[in-house]
Amino acid sequence: MDFVFALHSHLPYVLNHGRWPHGSDWICEAAIDTYLPLLAQLEQLERDQIATPLTIGITPILANQLASPVFRDEQEAYFAQRLKTCGEAAESLAGTGDAHLLPLARYWERHLLELRDRFRKYNGDLAAAFRHHEEAGRVELISCAATHGFLPLLSRDESIRLQLGLGRAEHRRIFGRDPDGLWLPECAYRPRGPWQPIPGGPAIPDRAGIEEFVTEAGYRYFFVDSHLAAAGHAFRLYGASGGSAEGGEIVNSPYRAYRVAGSQGPTPVNAFVRDPVSSRQVWSRQEGYPGDEWYLEFHKIRWPGGLKYWRVSAPGSDLGDKQPYNPEQARHRAGDHARHFVSLLGRIAAQAGGQGGQGGQHAVQGGPASAPSAAPASSVIAVPFDTELFGHWWYEGVDFLGQVYRELGRQAVVTPVTARDHLRQLPADRAVHLTTGSWGANGDFSMWLNPGTEWTWPRLWAIEATFWDAAPSALAAPAQHLVLAQAAREMLLAMASDWQFIISTGAVTDYAVKRFTEHCSDAEFLISALMPDATHLSAAQSRAAELWERDHVFPEILGAIKLVSDGKALS
């Protein structure tokens, strides 16, 4: 039985939008916590000749930042600040009752120095570092919508086409090849049908499903949460083993890839379904590995300095009762959990074999992982996660990931593969009509459309309408190209699903509101200069040049706008 481990790497555009607490420090922290440790782990496994067929998604907006000279400078400054903090922390600990934490302060200093050396080894270009591993055939890199726009709620088909097509083009520009796979932002999907997200708002009686845009953009597959497939209707493909296209009722198993069915039948696009059993073990602090008592406590931080010295400790313990962190013991637990995880995969494979690959019930019983019933050849366990879970939220997660691949190499029950290789070797023999939903809270769109965020959508929809109405004439006027291109960038940055998500969580609402309104205002001003009766094109050109220095992304966007405006695919 195949096993696909997929990671989704994303941050909104933060360069040139401040530093602390929510600006460039956001991406610099992610680089230290997750991206650099992950690259270090991949290199170590390569040296040890351990196969790591990871499927790694990097959103185009993140890839633009990771390849940026601005990021390189910001990261160097961040390293300097953090290393200075480590030195000051050691001095402050020495004269307090917390002197026993001094070895941990030195541990963090060594860790940061190692990461800085690695960063400089890559010349500060982390996108190129990930590209190296794909070119070596060790991982598969996949793409996403350009700025992680929440596709089901965008009002214009052209906007969806630009998000997907530009995302694909940017992936090709930065990583050197076309991606087969797509990470749908927030794993959000809607089928063909009526569209009216807000009662009384804009309505379209029959709108194309997301899979139609994905097909048009040239992608071969995406990932969905299990409830989108479980609630849909599955059927065998004509000519596949088992009969005709309507060959009887089929229980929708999460342990297979499906062709996504549209209104006219199966499309060329496939969907991998997230396994709820093994996934929960990895992401849940309450039920899974990250809540183990020996792992680093995320929430307790010592100020000044901002360093973490404590472990999770007893379940439910107060922050004041946390015990000192032991890195060696934590690494040992990561190995234990990796062995447990691979054993769990074996039990899932055994159950899938015993149920003929249906796997409709997700309870997995104990038992040896070494002698499962034969699972159907097309079976696959897919576990997609946010990359930032590993290292940032769960500090030991990167070590766990590396140990998982070591353990997988010691058994023969499940076979680790990239998503692309699974489909090449075992094409899907069933199709499914997916239902509307996402992998967010409640499994629907409510994290992005709710009373606290509803105000954002009419403003965004108005920008979409005026932009696409203005685009054809602006494309025909070279003097307007600079303004048109930057207006598109600002519109795309405003579309990032991050802003509604942050507002809904209540974490840093002011920052999300500021960024959303800022990009909307800039887009509105630039678009207004493209109107037939506009008299401020010169002022808009100056503003567009200023914004290009600030929001320096997607250098080839004008060609993508032209293709979309002409009704051509960007694949």
Regions of interest found by a model, annotated:
Residues 57-62, 145, 181-188, 227-228, ...:
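Short, solvent-exposed turn/loop segments enriched in Gly/Ser/Thr/Pro and often Arg
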Residues 155-158, 163-168, 174-179, 184-198, ...:
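Non-catalytic regulatory/linker segments of enzymes
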Residues 165-168, 173-252, 376, 381-411, ...:
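Catalytic domains of cell-wall/extracellular-matrix polysaccharide-remodeling enzymes
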Residues 30-41, 120-125, 159-167, 200-208:
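Aromatic- and glycine-enriched glycan-recognition loops and surfaces
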Residues 354-373:
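Compositionally biased, intrinsically disordered low-complexity segments enriched
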Residues 70, 75-135, 141-155:
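Active-site-proximal, glycine-rich beta->alpha crossover segments in alpha/beta enzymes
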Residues 1-51, 58-103, 238-354, 372-571:
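Active-site and substrate-binding clefts of carbohydrate-active enzymes
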Residues 43-49, 125-142, 172-175, 215, ...:
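Acidic (Asp/Glu)-rich catalytic clusters
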